[in-house]
């Protein structure tokens, strides 16, 4: 598996994450994640096929944001959070899977820092 470059825009409202690969001469679109509001994600696959998903809750069941909308912050963390051997991308209170689909959304909005670690060693996973 080759690494991709991920470009991200949006902290306080809409959140866009765009993954591209380099084929040796140019950037090639891999996927685009667009959290366009608190409950809607538009996803474009490698062929620009669009799917739209609606969310009515987030991962923790608290907070007001169900997608990456309004959950951004000023840095990005990358790691294999779900144990599938591929890295996920976290911006603020939301994580996008390696295919650009929303994986987690805590829903507490804009934070100032990200700390990803095995904070509870007795609990499986991160």
Enumerate the predicted regions with their spans.
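Beta-propeller-forming repeat regions
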Residues: 1-126
């Amino acid at each position: 598996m080759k690494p991709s470059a991920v470009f991200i825009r949006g902290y306080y409202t809409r959140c866009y994450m765009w993954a591209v690969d380099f084929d040796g001469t140019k950037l090639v679109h891999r996927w685009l994640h667009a959290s366009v509001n608190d409950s809607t994600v538009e996803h474009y696959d490698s062929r620009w096929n669009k799917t739209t998903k609606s969310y009515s809750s987030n991962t923790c069941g608290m907070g007001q944001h169900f997608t990456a909308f309004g959950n951004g912050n000023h840095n990005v963390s990358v790691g294999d959070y779900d144990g599938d051997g591929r890295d996920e991308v976290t911006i603020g209170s939301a994580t996008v899977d390696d295919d650009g689909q929303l994986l987690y959304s805590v829903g507490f909005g804009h934070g100032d820092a990200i700390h990803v670690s095995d904070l509870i060693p007795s609990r499986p996973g991160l």
